[in-house]
Structure formats: C-alpha cells, structure tokens
Curated annotation (Swiss-Prot):
The protein's Enzyme Commission number: 3.1.-.-
GO CC term (a single one): cytoplasm
Function: Single strand-specific metallo-endoribonuclease involved in late-stage 70S ribosome quality control and in maturation of the 3' terminus of the 16S rRNA.
Binding site for Zn(2+): H133, H137, H143
Cofactor binding description: Binds 1 zinc ion.
Lineage, top ranks: Bacteria, Pseudomonadati, Pseudomonadota, Alphaproteobacteria, Rhodobacterales
Recorded name of the encoding gene: ybeY
Keyword DNA-binding on entry: no
Coiled-coil stretches: none
Presence of the UniProt keyword Ligase in the record: no
Family matches, as Gene3D superfamilies: Metalloproteases ('zincins'), catalytic domain (3.40.390.30)
Organism: Paracoccus denitrificans (strain Pd 1222)
Homology family: Belongs to the endoribonuclease YbeY family.
Domain of life: Bacteria
Protein name: Endoribonuclease YbeY
InterPro entries to which the protein is assigned, alphabetical: MetalPrtase_cat_dom_sf_prd, YbeY, YbeY_CS
Amino acid sequence: MPDSADAPEEVPEFVDIVLEDDRWEDADLPAMAERAARAVGEWLGLDAFQVVVMGCDDARIAALNAEFRGKPKPTNVLSWPAVEFEAREPGAHPEPPGAEELGDIAISYDTCLREAEAQGKPFADHATHLLVHAMLHLAGYDHIDDEDAETMEDAERSILGKLGIPDPYLEHET
C-alpha cells in the first residue's frame, strides 16, 4: 500500500463547462478555460474557486444579452458574479473574493471567431483573453470609468503575459 505522502497531489478543477455549441469542443474550451482560471487565481492569490463557463453561439448569447442587459444582439462574452462587490475608489483593485463560487460566464464562438479574424489574432489567444476578462469581472473588476478600465486592462496584460499571450490592446494588422 503506497504511503499517502507518495500519492500525487490532487489538483482542483476551477471550471465547470457547459457546451451548447460543438465547435467549442473542437477548440478545446475546457482546457482554455481551466488555463485561464488557474492564471487568474494565481494572480488574485486564490488557491481554489469555481466558475461555470458556457460555450455557445451568437443566437444563444444574443438571447442572454437581451434578457440580462436589455441588448438583443450578440456579444463576445457575458458574466454573472456570484456575489455583489462593495463600491471602491476608481482605479483601485477590488478585494479578492471570499466566495468559492465566483459566478458564471457565457462566451460566443461566432463573435469570438469574427473578432479574432478581424484583429489578426489566433482564436485561442482571443478566447483566452475574453475568459480572463470575464473572470476578472467575476472577481469585482470593471471598466465603466477610465481609471477602472486601466486597472482591469493592466491586470489582463499581466495575466495573459504569464500565459505567453501578447497584449490584446495593441493595434493589430488585419
């Protein structure tokens, strides 16, 4: 019987995946989302948390966008935090969330692909950026005003840089 000290350490999964569009399976959304979640967790100083990510198409995300934001059109990504965050000074980092469940994310394959092609970016890099962006929203970041946008974009650049993904806010040739 092996010693429990010799047993491999169990690595927690951060992401539950719901695939409503099979193209996300081909793109390996589960691995992309898990990689993004681990990087966000490390950056936030969180050992474990849970996020639900739904990979869908433009029709589904347009319906969700209409229902929750009153905008009946497709968008790239939507997020629903599990907890409400206290107001903070503009540009300040939010307190790391204490909840184990951060919230839910929906990401549209169609819009993600269109944007990646228009910006001359690899699909996986763009999708990973959108997942990181949404996970930061779940952790209390936003980009409503310029100072908060700068703070959030700096966080995204830092996290994506550790993943080897170039700055998503640089101009790209098409």
